[in-house]
């Protein structure tokens, strides 16, 4: 641990209720800082019940870090697991009381109105909202995520919010998060000062703590490596360049992103990523045209066949990476 990582916990513990937005820049260890505060609260008997809400892509990483660093066991909840819990319990029993320490996706909670009543009648000692910028209020409208966060803000004494990007350039977004932490903090979301949010927010950049880390942050050195496409990659690229998709041609005036554009992105990611995109589109087309009377299916299968010929040896960027 580095000394600056203890500061959020120290700041929060100086208050009667631990409610804080940790907004350090990427790489300073916001998850670690949250874990330090959570561990101290557990040691003080104020952390028996914990709820962590994050985006789905971060659930595993957060769960592992809490266990490996702090021995805090978080049970992963999703819709199917909640339904499984509910099946074991009497009808009037709240499923959120079944486990004491859980982690759940923000979208799992926001998408099911049935959970709202259970959340309104549940209570936790600690609630953590990771990637908190996703729940900030935007303008005059409150998203489902923002409404969910506002509800959760009232279901715990301790509220820890984490984000590296606390605002979108507008003061209202930060103000909405501050008012979740303390409804009395900001009277006018368009007109407030740093003093209004003192003690609620901590934000540091690498330059702010450089003297504490003694060279821990090395300067990033970027070099450009060039690699020529293999013959099989060139063959697949040629098929793609000449490819015309009927569905795209008929939708060129639409506002959506054309499939060929998204396919191009996956193609330059990796052959496997492109094949996955092709398979998904073929499944949709075959469902819509069960007789197979759709030229796009044949065209996509031709590109897929060319991509399947690209072995790891033929995948030029991968081969180059192995040599670095």
Residue ranges and their predicted role:
Residues 1-15, 19-20, 301-319:
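Pre-Walker A segment
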Residues 1-10, 17, 30-33, 39-154, ...:
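SF2 helicase/translocase NTPase motor core
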Residues 21, 45-47, 253:
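Short helix-terminating capping/connector loops at secondary-structure junctions
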Residues 23, 53, 163:
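Residues at the beta-strand->loop junction immediately N-terminal to the Walker
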Residues 26-27:
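Walker A/P-loop nucleotide-binding motif
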Residues 38, 42, 217-228, 273-324:
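Conserved Helicase C-terminal RecA-like lobe
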Residues 91-92, 97-98, 103-124, 136-167, ...:
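Inter-lobe coupling linker of SF2 helicases/translocases
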């Amino acid at each position: 641990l580095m000394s600056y990582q203890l500061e959020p916990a120290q700041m929060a513990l100086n208050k009667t209720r631990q409610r804080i937005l940790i907004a350090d820049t990427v790489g300073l260890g916001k998850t670690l800082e949250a874990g330090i505060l959570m561990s101290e609260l557990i040691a003080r008997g104020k952390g028996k019940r914990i709820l962590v809400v994050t985006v789905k892509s971060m659930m595993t990483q957060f769960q592992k870090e809490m266990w490996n660093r702090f021995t805090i066991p978080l049970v992963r909840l999703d819709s199917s697991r909640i339904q499984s819990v509910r099946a074991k319990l009497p009808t009037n029993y709240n499923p959120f009381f079944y486990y004491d320490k859980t982690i759940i996706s923000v979208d799992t909670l926001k998408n099911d109105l049935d959970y709202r009543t259970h959340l309104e009648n549940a209570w936790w000692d600690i609630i953590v909202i990771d990637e908190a910028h996703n729940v900030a209020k935007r303008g005059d409208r409150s998203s489902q995520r923002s409404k969910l966060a506002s509800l959760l803000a009232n279901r715990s004494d301790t509220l820890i919010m984490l984000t590296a990007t606390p605002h979108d350039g507008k003061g209202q977004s930060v103000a909405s998060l501050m008012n979740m932490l303390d409804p009395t903090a900001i009277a006018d979301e368009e007109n407030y000062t740093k003093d209004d949010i003192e003690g609620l927010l901590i934000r540091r950049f690498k330059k702010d703590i450089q003297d504490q880390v003694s060279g821990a942050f090395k300067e990033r050195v970027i070099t450009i490596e060039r690699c020529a496409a293999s013959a099989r990659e060139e063959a697949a690229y040629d098929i793609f360049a000449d490819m015309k998709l009927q569905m795209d041609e008929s939708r060129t005036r639409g506002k959506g992103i054309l499939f060929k554009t998204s396919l191009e992105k996956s193609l330059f990611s990796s052959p496997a990523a492109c094949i996955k995109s092709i398979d998904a589109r073929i499944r949709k087309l075959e469902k819509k045209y069960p007789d197979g009377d759709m030229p796009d299916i044949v065209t996509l299968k031709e590109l897929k066949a060319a991509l399947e010929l690209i072995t790891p040896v033929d995948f030029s960027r991968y081969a180059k990476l192995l040599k670095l």
